[in-house]
């Protein structure tokens, strides 16, 4: 029996970030899964009145399914701490550090993890970024520092593409990060309660695993377990656990990598609130271990707590 059986569970979803649509799908799926496990669930679309809604619904525990700003940056976690409502996932500080790629990349390097060369530019300077500003040259990847789900991310192969890519990334949250493109196999690792569950290989139909490839069914192939040497699998799972611990994460995370031909796992980011939709990777990995989606959600809920 779950710790929270018989308690009023709020699944927090939606919000107003660029990842709202993904969050709506994640929240709906998780709410249904928790109901299948017998929980008393209310869905709460997060807005400026969320605190009043939580009080009115007499919520006793929160299942956070809120992607992007407000949900993954520590904001909703801070509110829940102040209301003394236990919640799933990482706390305020870990969420904020995981969401800010500039901060998390520095932490990864301090842990001795492999990080592709990169440069950080203020949003105001994005329109003036040129190839001469990049010691690693092209190809490169441009991304906003404070977004997830590959929102605003571009693979740049030619100098003429760099300016438009940087200007687009500057329209989102945070500074603009430009990093060296690493050729290799895209591998994501699910970590639950500090333990790596498994590594899944991602093969998008196009050259780049962008937002459409992540959330459009049939556009990407997944292979579990990942089709890389066993030694490389062990290395990437160990790196994922180190990143999870280093950021100070709780509950479930998804850690994204590019594994180079020599087996070096270049870490891209830690997702403190990974997607939980029909096409999401954490449920795929869990299913490969025989853990059903309702059971996975129940495990995540069971770890709900105040972190401060």
UniProtKB/Swiss-Prot annotation:
GO terms for biological process: cell wall organization; peptidoglycan biosynthetic process; regulation of cell shape. It catalyses: 2 D-alanine + ATP = D-alanyl-D-alanine + ADP + phosphate + H(+). It holds the Pfam family Dala_Dala_lig_N. Pathway: Cell wall biogenesis; peptidoglycan biosynthesis. Residues 105-302 form the ATP-grasp domain. Its cofactor is Mg(2+); Mn(2+). It is found in: Cytoplasm. PROSITE patterns: ATP_GRASP, DALA_DALA_LIGASE_1, DALA_DALA_LIGASE_2. Keywords: ATP-binding, Cell shape, Cell wall biogenesis/degradation, Cytoplasm, Ligase, Magnesium, Manganese, Metal-binding, Nucleotide-binding, Peptidoglycan synthesis. The keyword Nucleotide-binding applies. Mg(2+) 2 binds at residues 269, 271. It is an enzyme of class 6 (ligase). GO terms for cellular component: cytoplasm. Its EC number is 6.3.2.4. Mg(2+) 1 binds at residues 256, 269. ATP binds at residues 133-188. One of its GO terms (molecular function) is D-alanine-D-alanine ligase activity. Binds 2 magnesium or manganese ions per subunit. The keyword Manganese applies. Cell wall formation. Belongs to the D-alanine--D-alanine ligase family. This is D-alanine--D-alanine ligase.
């Amino acid at each position: 029996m779950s710790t929270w059986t018989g308690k009023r569970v709020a699944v927090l979803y939606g919000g107003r970030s660029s990842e709202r649509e993904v969050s709506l799908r994640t929240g709906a799926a998780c709410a249904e899964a928790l109901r299948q496990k017998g929980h008393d669930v209310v869905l709460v679309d997060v807005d400026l009145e969320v605190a009043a809604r939580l009080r009115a619904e007499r919520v006793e525990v929160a299942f956070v399914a809120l992607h992007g700003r407000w949900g993954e940056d520590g904001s909703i976690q801070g509110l829940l701490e102040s209301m003394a409502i236990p919640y799933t996932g990482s706390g305020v500080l870990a969420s904020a550090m995981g969401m800010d790629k500039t901060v998390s990349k520095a932490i990864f390097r301090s842990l001795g993890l492999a990080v592709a060369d990169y440069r950080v530019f203020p949003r105001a300077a994005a329109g003036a970024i040129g190839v001469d500003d990049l010691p690693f040259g092209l190809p490169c990847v441009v991304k906003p520092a404070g977004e997830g789900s590959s929102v605003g991310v571009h693979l740049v192969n030619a100098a003429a593409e760099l300016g438009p890519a940087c200007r687009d990334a500057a329209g989102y949250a945070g500074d603009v990060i430009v990093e060296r493109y690493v050729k290799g196999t895209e591998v994501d690792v699910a970590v639950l309660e500090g333990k790596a569950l498994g590594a899944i290989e991602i093969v998008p139909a196009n050259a780049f695993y962008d937002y459409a490839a992540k959330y459009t069914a049939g556009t990407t192939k997944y292979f579990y377990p990942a089709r890389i040497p066993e030694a490389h699998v062990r290395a990437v799972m160990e790196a994922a656990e180190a990143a999870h611990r280093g950021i100070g994460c709780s509950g479930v995370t998804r850690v994204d990598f590019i594994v180079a031909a020599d087996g070096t796992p270049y870490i891209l980011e830690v997702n403190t609130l990974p997607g939980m939709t029909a096409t999401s990777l954490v449920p795929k990995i869990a299913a490969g271990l025989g853990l059903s989606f309702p059971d996975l959600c129940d495990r995540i809920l069971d770890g709900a707590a105040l972190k401060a």
